[in-house]
Amino acid sequence: MAGPGSTGGQIGAGALAGGARSKVAPSVDFDHSCSDSVEYLTLNFGPFETVHRWRRLPPCDEFVGARRSKHTVVAYKDAIYVFGGDNGKTMLNDLLRFDVKDCSWCRAFTTGTPPAPRYHHSAVVYGSSMFVFGGYAGDIYSNSNLKNKNDLFEYKFATGQWTEWKIEGRLPVARSAHGATVYSDKLWIFAGYDGNARLNDMWTIGLQDRELTCWEEVAQSGEIPPSCCNFPVAVRRDKMFVFSGQSGAKITNNLFQFEFKDKTWTRIPTEHLLRGSPPPPQRRYGHTMVAFDRHLYVFGGAADNTLPNELHCYDVDFQTWEVVQPSSDSEVGGAEVPERACASEEVPTLTSEERGGFKKSRDVFGLDFGTTSAKQPAQPASELPSGRLFHAAAVISDAMYIFGGTVDNNIRSGEMYRFQFSCYPKCTLHEDYGRLWESRQFCDVEFVLGEKEECVQGHVAIVTARSRWLRRKITQARERLAQKLEQEAAPVPREAPGVAAGGARPPLLHVAIREAEARPFEVLMQFLYTDKIKYPRKGHVEDVLLIMDVYKLALSFQLCRLEQLCRQYIEASVDLQNVLVVCESAARLQLSQLKEHCLNFVVKESHFNQVIMMKEFERLSSPLIVEIVRRKQQPPPRTPSDQPVDIGTSLIQDMKAYLEGAGAEFCDITLLLDGHPRPAHKAILAARSSYFEAMFRSFMPEDGQVNISIGEMVPSRQAFESMLRYIYYGEVNMPPEDSLYLFAAPYYYGFYNNRLQAYCKQNLEMNATVQNVLQILEAADKTQALDMKRHCLHIIVHQFTKVSKLPTLRSLSQQLLLDIIDSLASHISDKQCAELGADI
């Protein structure tokens, strides 16, 4: 049968997970018609570019175009188009073309009247045309005729024709240093500088028919960004994102998103980011931001009088920032890259040690098999771009191209850099555990809370993995239950822990927690399952007080990570309207750090007079009023703490420790791999696998044991442990031979996306080396992965001198040794045979 099953008989994965497979996200393309084995797995063995590698491409020669900044770049097909900017002396209106396949620069063919020389304009691509709007024009050398523009030009890539659109009716105010993008057949422009003041208005115009179109001002709502200029915009998932920019005294590092459908702005909060985790980038201007996959990438700009060159990445799904670490071969001061070292040039096939990384292919199944070259010339080194501002960036395929900008000492650059993106299916670990919490399926513990004895159900495995305090409570409750059963002379069941006789679910374990109320405890439980909390409305008193109750529980339960989350949210939410209520509540709950924050907020010069005139101030307790007045008169000395902040352990860290032994006493299911038992936890398996979810819901084995296979194949013990690491805490790193066994596991076990499958395929494509080729050959033979077996034999034949010295060779089966001999015979020519005989 195709799939794992209980000892009472194996049940096909198709039958078990048939209904559950509908839970796979629509964007995930599983091939449900594929073979039950990996016989039909096709692989591509190169060439690849290193993930997160910066590569310095040929710069633009002066005879083609000047070095520049404040220009625009757009991507069309396999070329980058550069328009305008300034070279430090004059404004430009030339159009340059960079071919990304052969890395050649040229002047683009143009006819008609181009836009006047300008900089700080915008350029976008729609259909087969580039549209240029606005900017700052005139003679900067003589400082004459300088003015902002609001004209709109179209450049047709096919004919090279420049055309100005003459628009009737109301026009946007002339501007420069604005943001522009295309969405739903329209050009959208936002903010900028009109020569006197910064703006934050928005306009749009249809691009389908210039005869019938007109400019329309957009009625924006929500948390509209402050007036700003010199900022980038990027569009992802029907939203436009704006990050930082020049806003005078209001400049921040906030990230805003604009919903095109309802024309509403939202400031994306960062209060959920723990201290100790990567913060958002510094506030800046003159930077770039591009979108790729589910990420936004921010590079460069001027940040508080510095020119940083880190690449920051924002995950739209998880709302987190991180600094992208460049690959090891993105060397500072590396050798100049030959001008032909681009996409069209054949890249040599390298060992995994020489690669240092790999590019992720987005297709999981349909790639052609490649060949491996015996010669492996060294790949030229590349450089990281230096910090710069007023450069420009565009995306072609899975790479970002950055051109020009102003570098140190106000020098214009003519450099072109390429950055290789990575593209992996997202990790669904937190979502899967969160789904288990929301569904309340397979709950085996019930917490009885407070004086009202309200009940909240949960899962022993998750709770005991995340909280030592709750683990002790659960252990004590189990011991009391065991003593009670012993006193009542009740028969102790011999089944596996957590499995009642006849396969029925055991009764819930009751755990009393008198110091907790239901609502804050549910927020705490949500954190245990997902490592985050759904933040309520910022600044609303009721919601802030709720998080304060959660904070109190976090302190009592010794959950450092949750404690930090709550503190950051509360401190970010304190304002003039709620500070007194929060301060009084902090005093009542004995939350000294929050109370200190509120007191310091109240006595600020800009706050104090307003606060003491409020009616809420009159109702404060006398001790608190006295404390506020004394603090205002004599502020306590500030003593910065040198103690590092303990941010606690994450969900991933806790689940890793739980699998490695910390959760042994709470196992409630036994997985049998070729007769060898491996205790595990039902709730965790059900959360991560629709197969196990369906089994435990409808086909729970009576003896609490489940046989493990993937189709007709039983994986190796090492591969099985790799699969458990993925299930428990999302680990995808594994030996290549494990990947052969686990390639089909996402399909059979109903994982919620193909992340594991993508990593397995990539692992096989990139990491077959002389050192592990024999182990992979054995796994390929056992799983009947014919392409992989042929590739291993190919490596063995071409590297036989090295392979023959491996001790594993002598432990291969007779059939595999014969396969190696057959392959050697097929590839050795008569001349090589003669040379071999002479050596002997």
From Swiss-Prot:
InterPro entries: BTB/POZ_dom (IPR000210), Kelch-typ_b-propeller (IPR015915), Kelch_1 (IPR006652), LZTR1/Attractin (IPR051568), SKP1/BTB/POZ_sf (IPR011333)
GO cellular component: Cul3-RING ubiquitin ligase complex; endomembrane system; Golgi apparatus; recycling endosome membrane
Disulfide bridge partners, by residue number: none
PTM description: Phosphorylated on tyrosine upon induction of apoptosis, leading to its degradation by the proteasome.
Pathways per UniProt: Protein modification; protein ubiquitination
Location of region: Disordered: 329-353
Pfam family, one: Kelch_KLHDC2_KLHL20_DRC7
Gene Ontology terms: biological process: negative regulation of Ras protein signal transduction; protein ubiquitination
Residue ranges occupied by any BTB domain in the UniProt entry: 443-537, 667-736
Modified residues (N-acetylalanine): A2
Kelch repeat extents: 79-128, 130-185, 187-238, 239-285, 295-341, 399-450
Gene Ontology MF terms: small GTPase binding
PROSITE patterns attached to this UniProt entry: BTB
Compartments, record wording: Endomembrane system; Recycling endosome; Golgi apparatus
Keywords: Acetylation, Endosome, Golgi apparatus, Kelch repeat, Membrane, Phosphoprotein, Repeat, Ubl conjugation pathway
Assembly behavior: Homodimer. Component of the BCR(LZTR1) E3 ubiquitin ligase complex, at least composed of CUL3, LZTR1 and RBX1. Interacts with Ras (K-Ras/KRAS, N-Ras/NRAS and H-Ras/HRAS). Interacts with RAF1. Interacts with SHOC2. Interacts with PPP1CB.
Biological role: Substrate-specific adapter of a BCR (BTB-CUL3-RBX1) E3 ubiquitin-protein ligase complex that mediates ubiquitination of Ras (K-Ras/KRAS, N-Ras/NRAS and H-Ras/HRAS). Is a negative regulator of RAS-MAPK signaling that acts by controlling Ras levels and decreasing Ras association with membranes.
Family per record: Belongs to the LZTR1 family.
Designated name of the protein: Leucine-zipper-like transcriptional regulator 1
Organism: Pongo abelii
